[in-house]
């Protein structure tokens, strides 16, 4: 068996075109969607992520604002800038690129963002609302994975799903979205005993731990859907995920590649969340 490839690039292109149409409709009414991205320090990976987010905005008719600060920026200065953006009617979404320098409390920074502009979905108000099934925003990466399941008609109701990873950014919200969709969900992590015993029984496996080859072919049920959220580098310096793609793709029914899988969807869902924020603001105006 050779798995069907879940093409994040192609799906992302379709969804971005839809987002661009919605953005144009809002702009015609005087409510062009606006996203502010804040980068503190000079982390090379963060610089790439921010550049890609700004480009996605520009390519799809969004207003974008990039604030770049040195790593010496103080926490009070950052909080003051977020307060300004919270009050700026041109800005509908605020994103602070993580990680932040060690002297800045990322939790305090995230909580400073107005919940209605928290397009990452990390604010405690949105995280709590996700638990009730009625969030303002779904975190972008898990939201993108759910769109992949929808596009490729992967049945979730009654499915056994394993999420490897328990981060607030991917693992926990991914489990909640799968649960809401009717799956029976198991969360595995670094302390899990017999990881393979869980994954072999799963119809769906989402790997999100940032560790190469955490999932190999012998750990996968034939025909299962495997979603690789990991972003790592192999010994040659090439981008790879958490899944042994060469082996698992011969066993799984569906699989996402790295690159070209979940990555493009994360930025796309950031656009979707920003559109939704702008539409709410326009409706309230």
From Swiss-Prot:
Q: Which residues cross the membrane?
A: none
Which Gene Ontology molecular function entries are recorded, alphabetically? methenyltetrahydrofolate cyclohydrolase activity; methylenetetrahydrofolate dehydrogenase (NADP+) activity
What does the record give as the function of this protein?
Answer: Catalyzes the oxidation of 5,10-methylenetetrahydrofolate to 5,10-methenyltetrahydrofolate and then the hydrolysis of 5,10-methenyltetrahydrofolate to 10-formyltetrahydrofolate.
Assembly with partners or alone: Homodimer.
Q: Which CDD domains match?
A: NAD_bind_m-THF_DH_Cyclohyd
EC number(s) on file: 1.5.1.5, 3.5.4.9
Q: Please give the GO cellular component terms listed in this UniProt entry.
A: cytosol
Q: Which GO terms describe its biological process?
A: L-histidine biosynthetic process; methionine biosynthetic process; purine nucleotide biosynthetic process; tetrahydrofolate interconversion
Q: What is this protein called?
A: Bifunctional protein FolD
In which residues is NADP(+) bound? 165-167, 190
């Amino acid at each position: 068996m050779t798995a069907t490839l879940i093409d994040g690039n192609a799906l992302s292109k379709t969804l971005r075109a839809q987002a661009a149409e919605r953005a144009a409709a809002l702009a015609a009414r005087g409510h062009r969607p606006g996203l502010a991205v804040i980068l503190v320090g000079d982390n090379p990976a963060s610089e790439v992520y921010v550049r890609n987010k700004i480009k996605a905005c520009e390519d799809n008719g969004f207003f974008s604002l990039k604030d770049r600060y040195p790593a010496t920026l103080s926490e009070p200065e950052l909080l003051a800038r977020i307060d300004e953006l919270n009050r700026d009617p041109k800005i509908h979404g605020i994103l602070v690129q993580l990680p932040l320098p060690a002297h800045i409390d990322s939790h305090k920074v995230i909580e400073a963002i107005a919940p209605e502009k928290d397009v990452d979905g990390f604010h405690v108000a949105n995280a709590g609302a996700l638990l009730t099934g009625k969030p303002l925003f779904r975190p972008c990466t898990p939201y993108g994975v759910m769109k992949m399941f929808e596009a490729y008609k992967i049945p979730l109701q009654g499915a056994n799903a394993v999420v490897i990873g328990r981060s607030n950014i991917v693992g926990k919200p991914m489990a909640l979205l799968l649960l809401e969709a009717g799956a029976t969900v198991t969360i595995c992590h670094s302390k899990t005993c017999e990881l393979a015993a869980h994954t072999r029984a799963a119809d769906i496996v989402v790997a999100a731990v940032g560790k190469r080859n955490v999932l190999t072919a012998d750990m996968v049920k034939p025909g299962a859907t495997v979603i690789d959220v990991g972003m790592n580098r192999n010994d040659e310096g090439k981008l790879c995920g958490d899944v042994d793609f060469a082996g698992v793709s011969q066993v799984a029914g569906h699989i996402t590649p790295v690159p070209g899988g979940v990555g493009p969807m994360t930025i796309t869902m950031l656009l979707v969340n920003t559109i939704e924020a702008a539409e709410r603001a326009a409706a309230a105006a």
